[in-house]
Amino acid sequence: MGPVDQPLIRHDGFVEFVAEQLAPLGEVRPKRMFGGWGVYVDDVFIAIVAGDTLWLEVDDGNRADYDAAGAPAFRPFADRDTVMSYREVPADVLDDRTAIVEWARKAMEAARRSGTKPKRRVKRRSD
């Protein structure tokens, strides 16, 4: 199976591209959520894909990169002031494999610092 293969789930082309770009970091697993996608790397939730936009987890450890690029914060609701700790990845970073892997690695570190717990896998008993 490839980096984003999940039975019975169709991935769109952009999600496939994101997964391929992030593959050097570990096991990439996109998961459908709220009309978009959540992206896990080695069971750490690091990103949101909404349309053709990738948003990575941000904290004080990597915020300066996004500020320097003028990258906006993720606002899940157009009619509210709610801002989440994800920022848009600039197109030039997304298209550069070395750069996106570095930015995503920093997002993994941010996710770990924020206390995002790895998703527990349920083991099925075989009788």
Regions found by a protein language model. Give the residues of each.
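Charge-dense, helix-prone N-terminal extensions
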Residues: 1-127
